[in-house]
């Protein structure tokens, strides 16, 4: 494929934008470098770049675009919002409609509040949990990304009984020491952390199904045990459902798995492609939020009509009968096709697939936590990513990210993708 215009634009972007991108995940650093492709437009399941190349898209903007690009119903809602004014700074009736839709879909949301992003939603749930419990520390799980605010940019110390250390320049050690990080799916380490720090732990922050070191499901009984142990300790359980809400069913991963948290943070899908976040939970906890309580949270753009109307429209689309069954069908087809191609070419892969989301790890070992994901072959993934791009398949440029199937993908798209995987695997074994 010709990428000359993408290269020209990236060179120009480097002169004006830090790193040439507005989020590091859009660079190709995670796949061995190279020029990120600059897109011109998107429609349905397809991207079109500035050089005129077409791609089947599984990036889905890192998750929000579950209905495909430029869905007519969502486009109509956004157009209506633009015509009537996109920002008021006052309440609107649409906020009520959307809040009710979220509550009906995810019953643990007894009260909700809108924010501008998933990062803001997670950040505020932690503040509210601290206000409710009077404690300061949180427990999180290694490799789970919860946004770019200081408190969660923390990596594990030397073990579950040690405090976290900064995972980014600019994060202070004192901030990092408010976080205890333990391996996902490891109850022994979780119990040890509670034994050491229990009376200081305000909340346990959990991705109920991990989406940030690939798609990783909880081990049987793990989430139930986390809930029970946290509550015995007087700590709250916060589910970060920024990726998972409405991903696997019309509702949250908590509905899908049947395990209920105290607070939930959401984003991505619920905005229909526009910036949004939301959090909610038990009434007695949510009443700690201003103006009712002492935990302050605000936002100029929070609950703006454009994002709210886009979110309402997205959820209306997701109520289509049989949609999530189709996600499961196509996800299973893709998993099976990738695994067959891998066997054919003698390439070791593990495919973690949950409904319409999956991750291809270059390893013959199961991946159940961050350490196992980190041990997979990143160099081979980088070559695979670039090969797939040349075959017209757009993936996230990182071995830790997921492929997302949208309502716009067709069976023909899935079959074309499987053929591309077969072609690229063939080239990989030839050293190309």
Swiss-Prot record:
User: What residue range is the signal peptide?
Assistant: none
EC number in record: 5.4.3.8
Cofactors needed by this protein, per the record, are: pyridoxal 5'-phosphate
Output one GO MF annotation.
glutamate-1-semialdehyde 2,1-aminomutase activity
Question: Any one cellular component term from GO for this entry?
Answer: cytoplasm
Where this protein primarily resides, as one coarse class? Answer: cytoplasm
**What PROSITE patterns does the annotation carry?**
AA_TRANSFER_CLASS_3
Which reaction equation describes what this protein catalyses?
Answer: (S)-4-amino-5-oxopentanoate = 5-aminolevulinate
Name where it's found: Cytoplasm
What InterPro entries would the database entry show? 4pyrrol_synth_GluAld_NH2Trfase (IPR004639), Aminotrans_3 (IPR005814), Aminotrans_3_PPA_site (IPR049704), PyrdxlP-dep_Trfase (IPR015424), PyrdxlP-dep_Trfase_major (IPR015421), PyrdxlP-dep_Trfase_small (IPR015422)
Q: Which residues form a coiled coil?
A: none
Biological process (GO) annotations?
protoporphyrinogen IX biosynthetic process
Q: Which family does it belong to?
A: Belongs to the class-III pyridoxal-phosphate-dependent aminotransferase family. HemL subfamily.
The subunit structure is: Homodimer.
Protein name per the record = Glutamate-1-semialdehyde 2,1-aminomutase 2
- Phylogenetic classification of the source organism: Bacteria, Bacillati, Bacillota, Bacilli, Bacillales
């Amino acid at each position: 494929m010709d990428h000359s215009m993408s290269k020209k634009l990236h060179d120009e972007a480097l002169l004006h934008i830090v790193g040439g991108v507005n989020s590091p995940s859009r660079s190709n650093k995670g796949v061995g470098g190279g020029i990120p492709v600059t897109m011109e437009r998107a429609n349905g399941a397809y991207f079109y770049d500035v050089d005129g190349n077409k791609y089947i898209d599984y990036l889905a903007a890192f998750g929000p675009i579950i209905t495909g690009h430029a869905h007519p119903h969502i486009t109509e809602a956004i157009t209506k919002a633009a015509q009537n004014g996109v920002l008021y700074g006052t309440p609107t009736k649409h906020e009520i409609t959307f809040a009710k839709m979220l509550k009906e879909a995810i019953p643990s949301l007894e009260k909700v509040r809108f924010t501008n992003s998933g990062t803001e939603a997670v950040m505020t749930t932690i503040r509210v949990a601290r206000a409710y419990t009077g404690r300061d520390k949180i427990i999180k799980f290694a490799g789970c990304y919860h946004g770019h605010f200081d408190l969660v940019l923390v990596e594990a110390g030397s073990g579950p009984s040690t405090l976290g250390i900064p995972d980014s320049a600019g994060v202070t050690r004192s901030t990092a020491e408010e976080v205890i990080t333990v391996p996902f799916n490891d109850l022994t380490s979780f119990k040890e952390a509670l034994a050491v720090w229990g009376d200081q732990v305000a909340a346990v922050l959990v991705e109920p199904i991990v989406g940030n070191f690939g798609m990783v499901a909880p081990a049987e009984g793990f989430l139930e045990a986390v809930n029970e142990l946290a509550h015995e300790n007087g700590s709250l359980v916060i589910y970060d459902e920024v990726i998972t809400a409405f991903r696997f069913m019309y509702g949250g991963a908590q509905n899908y798995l049947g395990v209920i948290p105290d607070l939930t943070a959401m984003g991505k899908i619920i905005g229909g492609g526009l910036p949004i976040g939301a959090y909610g939970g038990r009434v007695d906890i949510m009443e700690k939020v201003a103006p009712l309580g002492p935990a302050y949270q605000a936002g100029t753009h929070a609950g703006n009509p454009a994002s709210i109307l886009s979110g309402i429209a997205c959820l209306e689309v997701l109520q289509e009968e049989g949609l999530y069954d189709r996600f499961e069908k196509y996800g299973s087809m893709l998993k099976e096709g990738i695994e067959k191609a891998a066997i054919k070419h003698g390439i070791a892969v593990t495919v973690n697939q949950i409904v319409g989301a999956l991750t291809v790890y270059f390893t013959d070992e199961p991946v159940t936590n961050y350490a196992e994901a980190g041990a997979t072959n990143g160099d081979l993934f980088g070559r695979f990513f670039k090969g797939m791009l040349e075959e017209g398949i757009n993936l996230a440029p990182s071995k830790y990210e997921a492929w997302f199937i949208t309502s716009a993908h067709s069976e023909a798209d899935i079959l074309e993708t499987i053929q591309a995987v077969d072609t690229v695997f063939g080239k990989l074994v030839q050293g190309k």
